[in-house]
């Protein structure tokens, strides 16, 4: 359209220029005509035809000019505005020509008499007139052509105006459509923003629900594991009760053989001793209705005798000859027993016969003795069939439902005086607890070489949180000296410690106590139990997802000081290289503060509100710092990432680029990355000198060394070797997925480190430690 308009304008300009040229030519012709007329008037023409011919010629010229002017005026009256000025000029020139004609006529009249000879002949004038007529005809044709061009230009102008109107209408419609599109786009954008906000709120709600469900699932898992451990303890207790019931069954069978003989021998004050070791059955304490019924069945033909109120002693060899002692001697023997005898077979049998530990067999004692023995055998066979491993939480609760029949209230009879029985049970449990606490107090104040068997068991159960090995320890370890002399093979075979990390924990603790006996105090790492490591410490370094693994393997402060990358990857399921480095740097920080929880907490408390001492910053403190530097939209990416102050300060390859990658800042946002680099340079670069001053203040040892420095045992029975330092941690600055080789360190104190860790099917029952996956035993 624009090209057509340009061409039309060029054509109009060309037509106007051609008209101007034709007008110029006409002016030149008129000028030439006037010049010739002047020459004719000056030459004097013929005598008869000169003045008349000149006058007629001038009149004809004037007429032609007038007609031409009139024609031009008629044709140019409706022309365009650009041609009007030319018409006015032509009119002025015509007026001038008329004046010149009048002047020439006057001159001719004055010079008619003397210039006749100079007048041109009529033939020449005719020729000139013909030429002028031809020129006027050409001028007329030119004017007609100009008029046709004007009409054509007018039509083209009309077409152009109509096209411009159509173009304007099209533009207006397009503008209206564009306004509608912009209006709809704004509306859709607002709707999409509202939808995005709603989705974000829904996402936050779902995230909170997800974490709540995870927390509930974790609590349910911990609860199930606790129930599982309790059920295992009850299993062990049931086995002990079954053994005691078997012994009681043999004793009852012995009593049933010679009833008349025992009745004749049961005189007041008479005492018969059989064997060296005896279990006490006091008759003056309340018996269950089933035992009384069985006694009535056995002695229905004999009258009541005062000896029934006395205590009967049955030797462990189950001889047929019973022994009877008085109430006073039995009570004196009970008073003389120490709290350490509570767990003895004598005390357990005494508690069983007094109704303190109800079992599933007591329900069958309501029938005669023979019937009860048959029921006992049937129940044993059923229990052997029902025994199976814990494969899932459903089995745990299924076994819990089966154990509901062990409620002591089901075995009580209306005549059995249940209140004294339960009271005696609570008293026995309280005595056991007091005895255990006394032994734990001895652990604190007595060297290990002076420990007795009970102290060793209390230390293993309470301090080391390993109750699963107490039974084997009670059978094989009778003193602290024996415990100090145990090798790794002895720990595995004698105590059933098949887990390499559990053996390492025991070995480190034993060597720590050995060093304490040599004149040094216990290491500060001994104060960090596995609960603090799994719950508090892992949460501080931002790796709480590994809490359950550390909890299951009972990783305490001493074990932290011995962990290497291989241990983290093989035993604790820490497969990510950066997480391994984060844990090792956290251990390095603990070493710098000499494993002192108080010093670490004091330094963290002082830098909670100001950006100082960043080496002790927790993962949560790093998140707070990221939010403070206006990067809160990326702060949540550091949750459970393992980024803490020790990584930012002690690892030189963890620079601003690695921090930006951990935060999830896109590589294209250079301004944000530069801002992060500047903030890190102002906070973390001066941290090295500050950390040195802090470590000097809190008394950090000058060099890194393990708390275990012995090369072997004093008796030479083990080839244990201990590392005194750590190898380099490796490069982590090039991102978190680098494939650099690991610098594994060997822990040489464990000769059989892989004792069945990968093959659980062939282990003995005491080695299957998955049953004790969650032990809630805290240090005293």
Curated annotation (Swiss-Prot):
It holds the Pfam family SAM_2. Residues 760-771 have a biased composition (Basic and acidic residues). GO terms for biological process: keratinization. CDD domains: SAM_kazrin_repeat1, SAM_kazrin_repeat2, SAM_kazrin_repeat3. Its main location: other. Residues 451-516, 529-593, 617-684 form the SAM domain. Residues 295-430, 692-780 are annotated as: Disordered. The modification Phosphoserine is found at residues 357, 372, 392. One of its GO terms (cellular component) is desmosome. Disulfide bonds: none annotated. Residues 79-261 form a coiled coil. SMART domains: SAM. Belongs to the kazrin family. Component of the cornified envelope of keratinocytes. May be involved in the interplay between adherens junctions and desmosomes. The function in the nucleus is not known. This is Kazrin. It comes from Rattus norvegicus.
């Amino acid at each position: 359209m624009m090209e057509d308009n340009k061409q039309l304008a060029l054509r109009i300009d060309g037509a106007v220029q051609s008209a101007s040229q034709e007008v110029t030519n006409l002016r030149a012709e008129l000028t030439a005509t006037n010049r010739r007329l002047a020459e004719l008037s000056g030459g004097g023409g013929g005598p008869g035809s000169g003045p008349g011919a000149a006058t007629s010629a001038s009149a004809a010229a004037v007429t032609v000019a007038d007609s031409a002017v009139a024609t031009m005026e008629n044709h140019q009256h409706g022309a365009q505005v650009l041609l009007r000025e030319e018409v006015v000029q032509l009119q002025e020139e015509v007026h001038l020509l008329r004046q010149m004609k009048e002047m020439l006529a006057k001159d001719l009249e004055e010079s008619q008499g003397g210039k006749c000879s100079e007048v041109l002949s009529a033939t020449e004038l005719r020729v000139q007139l013909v030429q002028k007529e031809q020129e006027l005809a050409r001028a007329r044709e030119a004017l007609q052509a100009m008029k046709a061009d004007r009409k054509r230009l007018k039509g083209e102008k009309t077409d152009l105006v109509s096209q411009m109107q159509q173009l304007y209408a099209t533009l207006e419609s397009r503008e209206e459509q564009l306004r509608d599109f912009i209006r709809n786009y704004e509306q859709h954008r607002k709707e999409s923003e509202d939808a995005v906000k709603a989705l974000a709120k829904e996402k936050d709600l779902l995230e909170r629900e997800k974490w709540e469900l995870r927390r509930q699932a974790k609590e349910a898992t911990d609860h199930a594991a606790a129930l599982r451990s309790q059920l295992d303890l009850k299993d062990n207790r049931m086995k002990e009760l079954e053994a005691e019931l078997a012994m009681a069954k043999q004793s009852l069978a012995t009593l049933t053989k010679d009833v008349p003989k025992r009745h004749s021998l049961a005189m007041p004050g008479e005492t018969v001793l059989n064997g060296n070791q005896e279990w006490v059955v006091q008759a003056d304490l309340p018996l269950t209705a089933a035992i009384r019924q069985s006694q009535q069945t056995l002695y229905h033909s004999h009258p009541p005798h005062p000896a029934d109120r006395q205590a009967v002693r049955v030797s462990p060899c189950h001889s047929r000859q019973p022994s009877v002692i008085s109430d006073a001697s039995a009570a004196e023997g009970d008073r003389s027993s120490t709290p350490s005898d509570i767990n003895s077979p004598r005390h357990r049998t005494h508690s069983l016969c007094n109704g303190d530990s109800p079992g599933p067999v007591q329900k069958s004692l309501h029938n005669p003795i023979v019937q009860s023995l048959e029921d006992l055998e049937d129940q044993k066979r059923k229990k052997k069939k029902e025994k199976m491993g814990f494969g899932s939480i459903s089995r745990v609760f299924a076994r819990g439902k089966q154990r509901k029949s062990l409620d002591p209230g089901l075995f009580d009879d209306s005549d059995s005086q249940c209140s004294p029985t339960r009271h005696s049970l609570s008293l026995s449990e309280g005595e056991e607890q007091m005895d255990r606490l006394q032994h734990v107090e001895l652990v604190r104040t007595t060297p290990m070489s002076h420990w007795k068997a009970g102290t060793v068991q209390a230390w293993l159960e309470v301090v080391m949180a390993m109750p699963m090995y107490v039974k084997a320890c009670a059978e094989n370890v009778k003193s602290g000296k024996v415990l100090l002399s145990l090798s790794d093979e002895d720990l595995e075979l004698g105590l059933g410690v098949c887990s390499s990390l559990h053996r390492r924990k025991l070995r480190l603790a034993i060597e720590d106590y050995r060093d304490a006996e040599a004149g040094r105090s216990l290491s500060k790492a001994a104060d960090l139990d596995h609960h603090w490591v799994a719950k508090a410490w892992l949460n501080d370094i931002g790796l709480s997802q590994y809490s359950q693994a550390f909890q299951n393997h009972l990783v305490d402060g001493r074990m932290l000081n011995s962990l290497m990358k291989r241990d983290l990857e093989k035993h604790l399921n820490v497969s990510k290289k950066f997480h391994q480095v984060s844990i090792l740097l956290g251990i390095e920080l603990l070493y710098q503060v000499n494993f002192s929880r108080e010093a670490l907490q004091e330094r963290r408390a002082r830098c909670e509100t100001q950006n100082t001492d960043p080496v002790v910053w927790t993962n949560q403190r790093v998140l707070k710092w990221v939010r403070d530097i206006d990067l809160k939209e990326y702060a949540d990416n550091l949750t459970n990432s393992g980024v803490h102050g020790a990584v930012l300060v002690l690892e030189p390859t963890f620079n601003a680029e690695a921090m930006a990658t951990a935060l999830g800042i896109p590589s294209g946002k250079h301004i944000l990355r530069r801002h992060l680099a500047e903030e890190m340079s102002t906070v973390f670069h001066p941290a090295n000198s500050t950390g040195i001053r802090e470590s000097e203040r809190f008394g950090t040892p000058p060099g890194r060394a393990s708390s275990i420095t012995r090369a072997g045992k004093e008796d030479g029975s083990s080839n244990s070797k201990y590392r005194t330092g750590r190898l380099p941690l490796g490069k982590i600055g090039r991102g978190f997925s680098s494939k650099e080789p690991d610098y594994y360190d060997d822990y040489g104190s464990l000769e059989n480190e892989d004792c069945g860790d990968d093959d659980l099917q062939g282990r003995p029952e005491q080695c299957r430690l998955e049953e004790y996956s969650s032990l809630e035993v805290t240090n005293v």
